[in-house]
Amino acid sequence: VVPKLQNYDGLIWGGSSLNIYNDTPEIRRQISFMKECFKNVKKILAICWGMQVAVTAAGGEVKKGAKGSHIGIANDIELTNEGLNNQLYKDKSNKFNTPAFNFDEVVTTPAGAIHLASNKINKIQGLNFKSGVSEIWGLQYHPEITYTKMVDIIKFRKDTLIKKRNRFKDEQEVNNHINFIQEEIKISKKDFRMLELRNWLNIIN
């Protein structure tokens, strides 16, 4: 795969249920592969786990979220001044809600990184930095996933979220949260949710 990386205009690295600080062999392989991408791919969009891998590979650090997690939705993400002027956020509102599912967060950014977005749970929701030949845009949230899919994931992981993750006390609390997300579905617009993807594709064209 590595010799062919230079054939691509860009790379999107998506999500995972792994925790990067667990430092397992499969995680180390992913970090190593990201470093190879930094040598060969000029434009990278790193989403959720992808951002955590990219940040770690570039010398930053990821830890368990100190202020909690996002289960299906991230509320009130706000763009920084740099975010407002970054091409990734062209036509985006300065504050928005978006699909998200994460328990970990970036706590130390790579050298020279530009902070693009944050909310009350995670300071780093959006990031732009360079490593090797690559320019990387990192998002902690998921513009590529619908809220409906997030609801399906919550239902699938319900027992884990209650018993292992301790994010909900019981099934009723899970259902209340799902109802909250379903209200967001009523007002969410696909084109707005996916603006970051559109803008990134325009960047690499």
For each feature predicted by the language model, list its residue ranges.
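Active-site-proximal flexible loops/turns
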Residues: 2, 21-22, 55, 109, ...
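Structural motif
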Residues: 12-14
